[in-house]
Amino acid sequence: MMVQPDPSHDEAALRRTADLYAIGADRRDKALWRAVLDDDCVIEGPGFTCSGLEENLGSIDLLGQMFRATAHRVSGQIAETAGESAQGETFGTAEHLLRDRDEVLAWSLRYRDRWRLRDGRWRFTHREIVIDWEETRPAKPGE
């Protein structure tokens, strides 16, 4: 009897990459990003493209320079696997507490994602950020 792979394991692992990416961005934790980004990962969004692991890790420093805090939330994901690759979309929001005033820049966004299974772990090879809408609103930062 041949045992069929359980796709729910891949789905959970792919979702975990998105969750760890979001947590890594908010905590400015490069180790979390290193765990979920492949060496040749490309992340692109409005007005920027980062290529390779080191350049992407450097963008965490830029987040810290641009914003006092961020809150990335993953609300859903659709993905399909094909052997050792996968593609899909990850949906969520990203809130950015501006550095120069008490306002939040909020995005409703999607990532068009591609992954590779390497050494038993799914890692992003490409993330394209698509902003569906954005808003700026007042914020009252915590103490």
Located regions from the model:
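Short, low-complexity N-terminal intrinsically disordered segments enriched in polar/charged residues
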Residues: 1-27, 31-35, 39
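Short, surface-exposed coil-to-beta transition loops
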Residues: 72-74, 106-111
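Short beta-strand edge/turn micro-motifs at domain boundaries
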Residues: 87, 108-138
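Extended, non-catalytic scaffold segments that flank or surround catalytic motifs
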Residues: 63, 71, 97, 127-134
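Beta-strand elements of well-folded, non-transmembrane domains
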Residues: 94-98, 117
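A short, polar/proline- and glycine-enriched secondary-structure boundary/capping micro-motif
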Residues: 97-102, 134-141
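A solvent-exposed, acidic/Ser-Thr-rich amphipathic alpha-helical stretch
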Residues: 30-94
